[in-house]
Swiss-Prot record:
Disulphide-bridged cysteine pairs: none
Function field: Effector that suppresses flg22-induced post-translational MAP kinase activation in tomato but not in Arabidopsis. The perception of highly conserved pathogen- or microbe-associated molecular patterns (PAMPs/MAMPs), such as flg22, triggers converging signaling pathways recruiting MAP kinase cascades and inducing transcriptional re-programming, yielding a generic antimicrobial response.
Name of the protein this chain belongs to: RxLR effector protein SFI5
Signal peptide (from-to): 1-20
Motif RxLR-dEER location, chain numbering: 44-62
Free-text note on domains in this protein's UniProt record: The RxLR-dEER motif acts to carry the protein into the host cell cytoplasm through binding to cell surface phosphatidylinositol-3-phosphate.
Similarity comment: Belongs to the RxLR effector family.
Lineage: Eukaryota, Sar, Stramenopiles, Oomycota, Peronosporales
Species of provenance: Phytophthora infestans (strain T30-4)
Induction: Expression is induced during host plant infection.
Amino acid sequence: MLRQARPLVVLIAVTFLVASEVFSMALASDQNSNVASITSQVQRLLRTHHATIKVNADSEERFLTEPPLTTDEMMAMMKAGKSKNAYAFELGIAGQMADFINSGLPDIETFKKTPEFQKYEFYMNFLNDMRKDDDYKPLVEMIKKNKGETEAFKTLLVKVEDSVSKKKASPSAIVKLDPLNREQAIVEKIELALKKNQALNKNKASLETIEHTVRMAAKSKPSTWKIFKIISRLKKLKLKR
């Protein structure tokens, strides 16, 4: 009896071992598949993130070289007494902005990338920066109070422009650069220096001359990569002539 039962026990044991091995292999295969799936997802995420960074970098590069508005345009709007809210209506985005504020719609990030909103934001930042200027602060304060179209604003504008003109004409006046348009002012100074250098000795302006002009224009040694990029670009343009 025992002899007959022994082969059966061995068969059951072998069957159990084989089943266990198959189950282990299947489990390992599932785990490997899950790991591979997760890894693929992470890699796709990294590729997407990298692509997003590249797109954002390209957008920032275009923004640095192609601002939504020029300083002259924004200065003209400010002197006309135009508020940021009035400009939003002019751009046709006032209603959308109100909807985002009241409803918190999910596609607000897409809206913020539109040319209209970028112009609005650029002008808003310009007004905030001009508010820090002692000369133009009273004008901006009146604009914020929706008094930009009043006679009082026009009278104040005449006084401000007269005061600014006198300061610019004074030889001892300290040049104050608008933080929003600092690089543009520096470029203008550099271009003027290049023209003077050409008139004096007909030689190509040296990099040292350009750097000195930048320091004089900015009242400090340039430390941002944007300023050095401007210098490099002007230098290359100069050498091509």
